[in-house]
Amino acid sequence: MEGEIYQSLILGYPNIISYETTKTIIDQMEQNICKINIGNYQGTGFFCEIPFPDKNNMLPVFITNNHIINEKILYDENPEIEIEIKFDGIKKLNLKDRYKYTNKEYDITIIEIKITDEITNFLQLDDNIINNIINNENKNEVYINKTLYIIQYPGGNLSVSYGTLENIIKEEKGTFFHKCSTKGGSSGSPILNLNNKIIGIHRQGLNNNSNKGTFLNFPIKEFIELNYPDYNLRQYNKKYGKYLDSLSCEKINIIYGKLGDEGFKHLCELKFTNLKEMTIPNIGITSIKPLEQMKLDKLEVLGLCDNIIPDITPLSKVNMKELKLLDLSSMNISDISVFEKVNFEKLEKLNFGYNNISDISVLEKVNFKELKELDFHNNFISDIKVLENVHFEKLEILNFNMNKITDINILDNVQFKFLRQLLLNNNNISDVKKFNKVKFRKLEKLELKNNNLSYEQIKYIFANLKSKFFK
């Protein structure tokens, strides 16, 4: 039956070889190719591995045309596509939280494949294409007049077509003409050489029996640059690093990029001598040990929030004597005892929000002479008695929102003469008998919402406190 279906497809397409000849190729490749269903429209896509960012780190991806999966589909609020793989049937891929890239000029879309997708068969790029990507070269002339083939889903059925690469269109970056016969549904098919390695993707059939394709090295390089924040640093250091004595950069700001531990290690190996700010939230790192090798004696701002780094002990081995702002929020931290060993005498703002901290006894052992803002919101702190022995003479904002505090009477022994804001919302506070003795003469804002306090207790507090005003 398959042979009959196949023969009915090839009428009028002389470069499509016989069913018997192609069956071996189809049997080998059918798990690497898939049919894409977008409404009533069908196309082809394929699975392959690409350097990310080099040969030592290959990333499995899914590739098709931009005119099949475009920006609207890719970045939809709930992006999902339906693909059909022979023997595996129909799979639905949710495209959220993946590396992805699409480009109308190249007519290509590249999407990361994850382990949970349960796709295990991947085509390989031709070595010349990989070298072009890694070395930023364009040596694609070697494919001119070479025999190629496409494995595709014309009319929704798997087939193979042979042809040659005619020429490269210099006016359209990465574009070439090929003679492999195609039909409706072939869009997004891989173009391979006789070594079964991919060189490009089929884009469009033309009226003159020629077809357009795109070399994969150009879009894959852009995919890496977009999704691997460390890529440009790697390329720069690879080319010039051995000649550099120092980098005078003052600011590093990588927002929500997936740098990862390997990329972070490489970043820390660069020779920064004048770095004043490093903000790297949610970049996928799990250790800050690489900071130990950096020269950070001029650093004033360090933001590490939204990375899962429970162990912050390496901070004790980093010289950051000029540090003024340290953001350690949302990092799964429970132990902050390392602060007994750090020397942050100029620190003004310290944020521990959204962690698992319950013990803050180390605060009586630290020397933060310039600290103005201390944030412990959303932790598991129940005992704040240590504040009696803390001397943060310049503290202006103290945030204990969303903790487990029950007793705040100890605050009558606390000397924060410049405190302007005291935030205690969403705790379990019930005892405020001694709170009328608190002497926060600069206090402007006191918040006690969502505690176990009666109206009379709250009235008692505000009636006895002599501050400027409360908001």
Language-model segments: residues:
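Protease-domain processing segments flanking chymotrypsin-fold serine proteases, especially trypsin-like
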Residues: M1-N56
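Serine endopeptidase catalytic core focused on the charge-relay Asp
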Residues: D27-Q42, N56-L59, I63-T175, N193-N195, ...
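Catalytic nucleophile loop of clan PA
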Residues: F46, E166, S181-R203
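C-terminal cap/linker of serine protease catalytic domains
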Residues: R203-N232
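LRR N-terminal entry segment and analogous cap-like coil->beta motifs
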Residues: N232-S287, L296, E300-C305
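Conserved hydrophobic beta-strand positions in leucine-rich repeat
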Residues: E250-I254, L275-P281, L299-L304, L323-L328, ...
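A structural signal for leucine-rich repeat
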Residues: F264-K271, I288-L296, I312-M320, I336-F344, ...
